[in-house]
Amino acid sequence: MKKFLAILMAAMMIFTFAACTNEPAVDEEVNNDVVETPVEGEEVKEETPVEGEETPVEEEVPVEAEDNTIVMATNAYFQPYEYYEADKIVGIDAEIAEAIAAKLGKELVINDMQFDSILTAVQTGSVDFGMAGMTVTEERLESVNFTSSYATGVQSIIVKEGSAITTVDDLYAEGAAYKVGVQLGTTGDIYASDDFGAELVSQFANGNEAVMALNGGAVDCVIIDNQPALALVEANEGLAILETSYADEEYAICIAKENEELLAAMNAAIDELIADGTIDAVVAKYIK
């Protein structure tokens, strides 16, 4: 009986082994690529991503924003036309430029730079216009266009109190060789260099430096626009402004020659701001 049971168990094991080895093998890689097709009517559930696993997001194509700015070049050391209050440039030119930009539907951006770099910046197109108490001259008209005048200016002479220079005529007197300080690139620089010769004219980056040279004895007088001259004399004891002016002039905005559309638009804006009293109000705010 025991022998019969042993033979029976052996036969069952052989049958089981044969059944296992005859089952078709499924390739694991193939299984991984199989996509289950849902049975019709069966609810399809979206797979929730595992925490930490990146979920693919469709990238949005950025829309390029329209540039709605207009860029002004100035030299912000020309009070009260342009100067700093904290880190902001303010003054007559800054406010008038803001009003013009508003008329054009633009946001104003002001770039501060050396005065003698303004024309180049306008010519090369790195800025849209230059506004810095700038006078129209034949020399400047060769490289840029100018708008209508929006303000008038006077070139004044600053001297030390008790100076031998008491009138403008003293600078032209026979044998006179007074040293004149000017801001580089300004009409004061242009006129003085023409009148007295480059050897007698010392050029400085701004009016403050020119006045420091006057106080230090490096120059005998400083020629600069009247309004900045008033501010400089007020800030420095022992200085005075001659009663007679050196030159009278008008201020305008410089624009690249090829930008005639902007020139026409700014002239129209200036005319409107003069007509409605805006420019007079701005000037009166700074010049009492």
Say what each PLM segment does.
Residues 17-28:
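Bacterial lipoprotein signal-peptidase II cleavage site
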Residues 29, 64-133:
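Extracytoplasmic small-molecule ligand-binding "clamshell" domains
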Residues 60-62, 67, 187-204, 237-245, ...:
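Ligand-binding clefts/hinges and TM-proximal coupling segments of bilobed small-molecule sensing domains
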Residues 75-76, 152-161, 226, 230-271:
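Periplasmic-binding protein-like
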Residues 94, 109-122, 166, 184, ...:
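Short helix-initiation/N-cap motifs at beta->coil->alpha
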Residues 105-107, 123-132, 176-179, 206, ...:
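Alpha-to-beta junction loops
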Residues 116-117, 132-142, 191-194, 215-216, ...:
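A ligand-binding cleft/hinge motif common to bilobed small-molecule-binding domains
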Residues 147, 159-179:
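Flexible hinge/capping segments at coil-to-helix
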